[in-house]
Structure formats: C-alpha cells, structure tokens
C-alpha cells in the first residue's frame, strides 16, 4: 500500500542549473537553481524559477535574458557554492576562478568552464507564489566539442551532468542508457493486421 507524502514539489532528479546574469552594475553573476527545465518544443523554451529575494531576480527582471549552464560532475562544488553565496556579498565567479564572456545573442554572460550553456531571452514571467517562473526562449546552445559526437549530438557519458534530489538535498550522476525512447515500448504495441 502506498503512503501519503503530502503536497510538495517532489519530482526528481531536477537538473542542476547555473543561471548567468549581469547585475545592475554590469557585473557577471551566477546562481544555482534546481527548479527548471524544458517547457516547450516550438519555439524552444526552458524555465527557471527563483524567489524574489535572490540577487539574480532583479537582474532577470531588468535584463530580460539569462544563460543556463548545465552542471557537470567536475563543477559540483562550484555550482553548490553558487547556490549558497549571494552576489550581493561579492564576486562569486571570481572567488571560484571562473571566467565569462558576453553572449553575442542575449544580455547575459557565458561561463567558459561549463561545457553546455543555453542562451535565453525571457518571453514570459509568471509569479507563482514563493517562486517566480522565467520562461526563456532558447536563442542558441553552445557546447564544448568534447561533449558532442560527430553528428553534433550530446554525449551524456562525456558531459556527466548532475541531477538533484530536492527532499534529501543530494547530487547524483547519470547512469548508462537503458533503452531508446519510442522504441523500447514497441513490444507492447498491438500487432498490425497483414
């Protein structure tokens, strides 16, 4: 018998995303967020949800853009720090020795050391309660060559992305592929009459 866990945001794993913005002084800043993901295929859109109290919130409202960096295993501690410290208190990226370049497509920084980044223009803002959801239309995705195959597809084994388990606050790696989507379930499809 199943046990009730109550009403709470428990879907997992959530991606470990680093949101890049420029603050009101034009300085690059970044924070880690776990509330985010894909929300639309055409146009390609992703979301990230933040509390109004965060330093990044005002930057998103002012700049109408963000970059979304996918955290990989080598950047676990850096991403965790970016979620713990506030840009109000100092240069978090400088503390970590991370370098940025200005996106050519949106008014937000790209952190060079992260292997995968989505450049997003904010197209919708939804105040949901404690969090505000920022829907970003993806303008482009930049990826290091080492995480791509010869056709330009992402190699998860090379990327080594992290997932986050919200309830127990733990980071997890990704395992090997277990099957192909829209293929593994074919054995349950009814046979077509000949």
UniProtKB/Swiss-Prot annotation:
Pfam hit, one: Flavin_Reduct
Protein name: Flavoredoxin
Summary of the function given for this chain in its UniProt record: Participates in the reduction of hydrogensulfite from hydrogen.
Cofactor note: Binds 1 FMN per subunit.
KW Flavoprotein (keyword) present: yes
A GO MF label: FMN binding
InterPro entries, per the entry: Flavin_Rdtase-like_dom, Flavoredoxin, Split_barrel_FMN-bd
Family listed: Belongs to the flavoredoxin family.
SMART domains reported in the protein's UniProt record: Flavin_Reduct
Organism: Megalodesulfovibrio gigas (strain ATCC 19364 / DSM 1382 / NCIMB 9332 / VKM B-1759)
UniProt keyword Flavoprotein present: yes
Subunit note: Homodimer.
Alphabetical UniProt keywords: Flavoprotein, FMN
Cofactor section: FMN
